[in-house]
């Protein structure tokens, strides 16, 4: 008996009770029936449960420098004397820019770029995509927009790339479906185990086939020479993908010694190797917009008690307080901060070097992190 049948019977009984109430017992039964009818009416009118949608969450990426995202761009008051970057704009066949989700307000639609890569969707714990950024959050750019796909774990990369675990093909299906509103897919898998290089190539081959007419761009780590058993064999990847973006940055990083994010000499060697492996029409050289800082001495650490006791002695700490019996103290030290960054001048000098070497396409990581003057010195070939 379904919900509707039960309600009809209860309504009939309650109607009879109302028309011929005899004593308190019948009145009580009538009242109970009426209450049941009301409750069941509400329950039966509840619509079917909608399909569950993964809530939008922020995903930290190792590829992205940590930064606080301001609410909107502001006019800059430069802190140091400026050097003009060039007399005439540099022209490239294509200029790609990456945009992180959450930086939409920083999207400069008037900037001279030919396509945008929207960062991004990530593989979750069980081998499926966590979420996909919505293209409709972007304005109508009248330019191609790529979806960026990442996998931020070496062990997870192994499980989704090695076909024996049966996760690769379902993931490819998800990626193809996620790319439907976009013009192409940008694969940024930076944590591939050494033994999975062959599996990565197979993954790209199957993915490219399933994408059909959609473009496939693959990000690869910077190299200055061929490495044995490299998981990013430039030449082989270029035979599969429509283009390769060489991430020529992070020469120095947060845990290394201070230095350039991408020095000119290092970038020159990276480009020389890339040009020897990848056809010019498929090669994209990536440039950084961001900078990094380093602080010396590095004081965030764990201590053994004897070492900590020596530190307190050296810094003349004699006052130690307790909170719930646990000792703590504070002291001041002088720190030295080193900052290496890029402005319009350094970015354009690096871009000019690439152009002089025969590079026809460049990409920037990422919009919203740049010196805004940089756009005055770039243009896309008509």
Regions found by a protein language model. Give the residues of each.
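Conserved, mostly hydrophobic/aromatic
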Residues: 116, 187, 244, 285, ...
């Amino acid at each position: 008996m379904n919900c509707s049948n039960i309600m009809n019977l209860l309504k009939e009984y309650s109607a009879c009770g109302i028309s011929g109430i005899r004593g308190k017992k019948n009145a009580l039964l009538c009242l109970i029936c009426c209450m049941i009818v009301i409750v069941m009416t509400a329950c039966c009118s509840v619509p079917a449960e909608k399909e569950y949608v993964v809530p939008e969450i922020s995903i930290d990426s190792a590829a992205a420098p940590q930064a606080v995202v301001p609410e909107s761009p502001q006019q800059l008051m430069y802190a140091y004397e400026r050097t003009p970057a060039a007399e005439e704009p540099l022209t490239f066949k294509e200029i790609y820019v990456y945009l992180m989700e959450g930086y939409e307000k920083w999207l400069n639609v008037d900037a001279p770029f030919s396509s945008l890569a929207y960062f991004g969707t990530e593989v979750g714990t069980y081998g499926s995509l966590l979420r996909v950024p919505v293209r409709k959050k972007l304005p109508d750019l009248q330019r191609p927009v790529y979806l960026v796909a990442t996998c931020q774990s070496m062990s997870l990369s192994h499980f989704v790339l090695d076909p024996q675990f049966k996760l690769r093909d379902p993931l490819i299906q998800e990626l193809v479906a996620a790319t439907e509103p976009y013009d192409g897919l940008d694969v940024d898998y930076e944590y591939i185990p050494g033994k999975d290089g062959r599996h990565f190539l197979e993954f790209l081959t199957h993915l490219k086939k399933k994408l059909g007419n959609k473009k496939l761009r693959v990000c690869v780590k910077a190299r200055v020479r061929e490495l044995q058993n490299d998981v990013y064999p430039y030449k082989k990847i270029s035979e599969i993908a429509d283009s390769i973006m060489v991430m020529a940055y992070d020469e120095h990083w947060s845990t290394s010694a201070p230095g350039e994010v991408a020095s000119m000499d290092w970038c020159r060697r990276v480009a020389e190797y890339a040009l020897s492996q990848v056809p010019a029409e498929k090669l994209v050289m990536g440039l950084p917009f961001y900078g990094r800082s380093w602080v010396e001495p590095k004081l965030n650490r764990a201590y053994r008690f004897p070492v900590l006791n020596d530190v307190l002695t050296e810094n003349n700490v004699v006052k130690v307080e307790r909170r719930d019996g646990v000792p703590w103290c504070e002291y001041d030290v002088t720190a030295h901060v080193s900052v290496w960054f890029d402005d319009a001048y350094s970015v354009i000098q690096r871009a000019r070097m690439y152009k002089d070497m025969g590079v026809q396409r460049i990409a920037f990581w990422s919009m919203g992190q740049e010196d805004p003057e940089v756009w005055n010195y770039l243009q896309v070939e008509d």
